[in-house]
Regions:
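Noncatalytic, solvent-exposed loop/strand surfaces
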Residues: 1-334
Length: 334
């Protein structure tokens, strides 16, 4: 774990969570630290898959750690190939929630953020997946939403009880669920399904084919990157550089454009700020598209290093992690 001053980039502290031989193999595009750390402002949690889950305070003091077992995560149709984990932990109302989908024995677990003790653990009849769970703060209740090959599911985050499920997903699921005020968006890009589902909150039971699905698209879901809701539009970036914009409420296609990249594709997710959408490519180019119903490519910025991680936006800064460099990008001071 590394901590930096956001304003200056000065290193503040560094902690080694695990030392030893890795317990599993990994994909060539992955690392053993692919998951994103999470914090609620009091506890900082980092997840390294089979190498464990580690909690610190904001000064880097170790608080607790948990071994969740060896996770066998890889291609469902070629189990000898292990790709490694990528799902990140989330914090919600004093709970650390981790989705652990693997070849056999998939589960989702909630731990006490102060002690690391198990609060609940729910088994999942699922193939390996790589998306991060998300809590949809609905008007009537909160729903813990997970992507998955057999079913997209909603759980009660307090108990782990399944509330609803939706079939029809891809056999490989990587994007993270996202939401607006009343709609939940879950996508995946493995064909032949490659769906985008827009789901109304508050569902119960099996909602496959029901009116709880506001709209859906087939063979339009992104393979790795998570879609983006910005304003009244839903954006999706395919790994080959096809960029789609839809009307979030009704599902109408606004545009479908190819980003003019060279070489490799796109793995990081699009992010947005101040009316612009930023699309990072694996080659290290960040394309800038104006948000809204008309496609307008505003620029292309070369970072000159491979870029696999999604940028983070905080306190007027865009934080970009390339292969060897951590960048903070800000508006020029007047």
């Amino acid at each position: 774990m590394l901590c930096f001053d956001l304003k200056t980039g000065k290193p503040l502290w560094e902690r080694t969570a695990y030392e030893g031989w890795p317990k599993e193999k990994r994909h060539v595009k992955s690392t053993y630290a692919s998951s994103t750390p999470a914090t609620d402002g009091r506890v900082l949690v980092a997840y390294f898959g089979s190498e464990g889950l580690y909690a610190y305070d904001l000064d880097g003091k170790p608080l607790w750690n948990r071994d969740l077992g060896r996770l066998d995560v890889g291609a469902y149709d070629a189990p000898e190939y292990e790709w490694g984990t990528a799902s990140s932990p989330i914090l919600y109302e004093g709970r650390v929630i981790v989705q652990c989908d693997q070849q056999k024995g998939s589960f989702i677990i909630a731990l006490d953020s102060k002690s690391g003790e198990t609060l609940w653990r729910t088994g999942r009849d699922e193939l390996p997946s790589w998306g991060t769970p998300a809590v949809f703060p609905g008007k009537a209740r909160a729903e813990l939403v997970t992507n998955g090959s057999n079913f997209i599911r909603g759980y009660d985050p307090a108990t782990g009880k399944e509330l609803w499920r939706l079939g029809g997903s891809s056999k490989i699921t990587t994007p993270t669920p996202i939401y607006s005020d009343s709609l939940i968006v879950v996508a995946s890009g493995r064909r032949p399904e490659a769906p985008i589902f827009v789901i109304r909150g508050g569902a119960s039971g099996d909602i496959t084919g029901s009116a709880q699905v506001a709209w859906q698209k087939q063979q339009r879901g992104p393979y790795i990157s998570t879609p983006l809701i910005y304003g009244k539009y839903l954006y999706a970036l395919g790994n080959a550089g096809i960029f789609d914009c839809y009307d979030l409420a009704g599902g109408g296609e606004i545009y479908r454009q190819r980003i003019p990249h060279q070489g490799s594709g796109f793995s990081a997710s699009p992010v947005a700020s101040d009316g612009y959408i930023y699309l990072p490519s694996e080659d290290g180019d960040i394309f800038v598209v104006k948000a809204g119903p008309a496609f307008e490519l505003m620029g292309q910025n070369a970072m000159d290093e491979p870029l696999m991680a999604t940028p983070a936006i905080a306190s007027g800064s865009m934080i970009v992690r390339t292969e060897h460099t951590l960048w903070a990008i800000r508006r020029r001071a007047n």
